[in-house]
Amino acid sequence: MEFLSDLSTTINIPDFTKRVNNNLKRELAGYTIIQDKIVQITSEQEVKAIEDALQIASKYKSVETHLNQSLELLSNRENPDYRNSVKESISAVEAYCSILTNDSKATLGKALTQIEKTHKIHSALKSSFSALYGYTSDSGGIRHSLLEDDIKVTLEDAKFMLISCSAFINYLKAKE
């Protein structure tokens, strides 16, 4: 189906992905096609958050690359890589925030501090996203450590991060 979804624009099958998604929904399949990838996300709001973020990201290569890679890693049924999907999701936010602050070397924490002032986001919201970044970045976290006692990253973790990071990108875009 992924192949056909990707091919549908080339051979001009109108609304192929939409039709398949309608059938998947009707049959309660538990899957949706997003960006020609079959993923275990079915909530219309969650799908919309990801699709909207991908639309925003299409203007920024780095953000688009991270979001697409996160989706790719999440949707790989033979060898899913949830850990790296989480990394790519938070990296998309970091890339978008560095674009918003016009500081390509800014860490997410530094960029959020500036965005808190310029985009008037609430300090608790800034803190919560900083904490999510910390979850992915601390010594036992997802981005830096591959020790035996590591956190086991699950499908639910990767879905949460992709959806949350997509929603946060959408939120920041709306605040511009």
Predicted regions and their residues:
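Acidic-enriched, low-complexity/disordered segments with a strong bias for Aspartate over Glutamate
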Residues: 6, 15, 36, 52, ...
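Long, positively charged binding patches that form subdomain-scale interaction surfaces
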Residues: 40-126
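Internal, Lys/Arg-enriched amphipathic helical interaction segments that engage polyanionic partners
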Residues: 1-65
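Long, charged low-complexity segments
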Residues: 108-176
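Long, hydrophobic, amphipathic alpha-helical segments used as structural scaffolds
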Residues: 8-11, 15, 31-35, 78, ...
